[in-house]
Amino acid sequence: MAAKDVVFGGEARARMVEGVNILANAVKVTLGPKGRNVVLERSFGAPTVTKDGVSVAKEIELKDKLQNMGAQLVKEVASKTSDNAGDGTTTATVLAQAIVREGSKYVAAGLNPMDLKRGIDKAVTALVAELKKASKATTTSKEIAQVGSISANSDESIGKIIADAMDKVGKEGVITVEDGKSLDNELDVVEGMQFDRGYLSPYFINNPEKQAALLDNPFVLLFDKKISNIRDLLPTLEQVAKAGRPLLIIAEEVEGEALATLVVNTIRGILKVVAVKAPGFGDRRKAMLEDIAILTGGKVIAEEVGLTLEKVTLADLGQAKRIEVGKENTTIIDGAGAAADIEARVKQIRIQIEEATSDYDREKLQERVAKLAGGVAVIKVGAATEVEMKEKKARVEDALHATRAAVEEGIVAGGGVALLRAKQAAGDIKGDNPDQDAGIKLILKAIEAPLREIVANAGGEPSVVVNAVLNGKGNYGFNAANDTYGDMLEMGILDPTKVTRTALQNAASVASLLLTTEAMVAEAPKDDAPAPAMPDMGGMGGMGM
C-alpha cells in the first residue's frame, strides 16, 4: 500500500480552501448576463468554449492532492445541483465558496465547527421556507420564455423556442435537443405518439415523396407474439376489408408467408395494410403495447387474457385518425382512446416514476408519459461552427432544465434578489448558543455572494448595488445587462424557485462538511528516483587526424 500524508486542523482546512477557491474562481466568471467564457482544452480537436458552470467544474483536477479534495467537494455541489434542478450550478459554486471562506475564519478564531454547522442548517431551513412563500407559479408562455432566456445567458431566441415547444407538446411533453443543419434554431414537433419502429417491407410505402406509408382512419391490430401463418390473420383481414378501411399491424414479428401475403395484397390494391414490429423489449414491450391500446381504444391480443387472433372482432381493434409509418418511426395521430382511460394510465405510470430506482427506468417511463399526454418536440440548434454548436447546445439544454424546474416549483425574482429578500423576510433567526448564531450570521452574509459576483462580472461596484437592493422592497433589484434598477419580474429576470433552493441547500451541505473537517489523508507524493549516471565511455582513441 502506498504511503499516505495526514494533515490536521488549520493546515488541512487552509489547503482545502485553496482548492475551493481555484475551482470557484474559474467557474464564477461565467455568472450573470455579462459573464465571460471559459475555454477547455481537448486532447484532440478544437477546444470547447463554454459558459456552463458545471462543464467548467468537471474539467478541473488539481495537482496538489489536498487542494484537489476541496475542489472535488465543490464540484459535487455543482453536479448535484445540475442533477436535481438542471441549472444554478454557478450560483451553487459561488455560494459554497462564500460559506467556506467566511466559515473558515470563524473556525480559525476558535468557534465550534459543529455548532457553526447547526447554525448554518437553521438559517438554510428558514431561508428555504421564505423562498417557497415568495414563489409564484409560472402560468404564461412569456414567463417560461423569460426563464429560458436567463438560463441561456440572456439569449432570448432560446427562451422563445423552448416556450413554443412547451406550448405545442404541453408541459409534460418530451423536448429533445439535436444538432441542426442551418445557422438558425429550428423547432420540429411530432404530434401524437411516435415509436422507433418502421415498416417491415418497403412495398408498404404508398407515398413515394415522403418514403412513408400513410394510413387515414385505420384500424390497429396489437399482438404480443410472432405472426408467420396467414391463416391466423384471415378473419381480421376479412372484417377490415369489408369495413373498407386500412389496417396497421403491430406485432413482435410478422414474417414468412404472413408478410409475403400482406405485401402481395397491398401491391394489388386489395387491402391497404402495413406491418411493423412492436416497440421496446421484454416487459417494456408489453407495457408499450398496452399504452398504444389505451391510446387507440383497442386491446392487446394476448393468450394470457384469453384472446386469440382467430376470435378478433373489429371492437378489439384500436383506431386512429391518421398513422404515418416511415423507415424508422411510426407516428399515431389522434388515437380513438377515451380521455379518462389515457389520464388513468398516465397517473399509473407517474406512480411508477416515483418508485423507480434507476435513472434509465425513470427516463423511459417519463418518455411513455409524454407520448401519451402530449407529443414530442425536437429543438434543432443551428450554429456556424462545431465549437459554437456544442456551446449553444449546452445552453439550450440548461435552459430546458430551468424551464422544467420553473413549471414544477414556480419562479422567484432573479439576479440574486430572491435570496436577499428571503434574508429580510426570515427576520431574526436565533441559535441555541453564540456559535450557532455565528453560523446563522455567516449564511446571511454569504447569500449576498451571487449578486456581488453578477455585479463584479458586469464591471460594477458590488457593495453599492447590494446596499441599494437591500434598501428596496419586493422584487426591486439590479439588471446587470443594462445597469438599471427596477422590478425584476417586470424586467423578465426570473429564476426557478427549485434552482435557487437547490443551489443554497447543496452549497450549505458541502460547505458544512468542509468546515467540520479536522484531518485529511492523501497519498504521499512519490520521490522521483535520480536518473542513473551515464556509463563510462572508455578511451575513445584513434580520433586524431
From Swiss-Prot:
Cellular component GO terms held in the UniProt record: cytoplasm
Region (Disordered): 526-545
PROSITE patterns for this protein: CHAPERONINS_CPN60 (PS00296)
Key words, A-Z: ATP-binding, Chaperone, Cytoplasm, Isomerase, Nucleotide-binding
UniProt cross-references to Gene3D superfamilies, sorted A to Z: GroEL, GroEL-like equatorial domain, TCP-1-like chaperonin intermediate domain
Keyword Membrane assigned: no
Main localization, broad class: cytoplasm
UniProt: ATP binding residues: 30-33, 51, 87-91, 415, 479-481, 495
GO biological process, any: protein refolding
Listed EC numbers: 5.6.1.7
CDD domains: GroEL
Molecular function in Gene Ontology: ATP binding; ATP-dependent protein folding chaperone; isomerase activity; unfolded protein binding
Catalytic reactions of this protein: ATP + H2O + a folded polypeptide = ADP + phosphate + an unfolded polypeptide
Localisation per UniProt entry: Cytoplasm
Superkingdom in the source lineage: Bacteria
Protein's UniProt keywords contain RNA-binding: no
Family recorded in the similarity comment: Belongs to the chaperonin (HSP60) family.
Assembly and binders: Forms a cylinder of 14 subunits composed of two heptameric rings stacked back-to-back. Interacts with the co-chaperonin GroES.
Role played: Together with its co-chaperonin GroES, plays an essential role in assisting protein folding. The GroEL-GroES system forms a nano-cage that allows encapsulation of the non-native substrate proteins and provides a physical environment optimized to promote and accelerate protein folding.
PANTHER family: 60 KDA HEAT SHOCK PROTEIN, MITOCHONDRIAL (PTHR45633)
Protein known as: Chaperonin GroEL
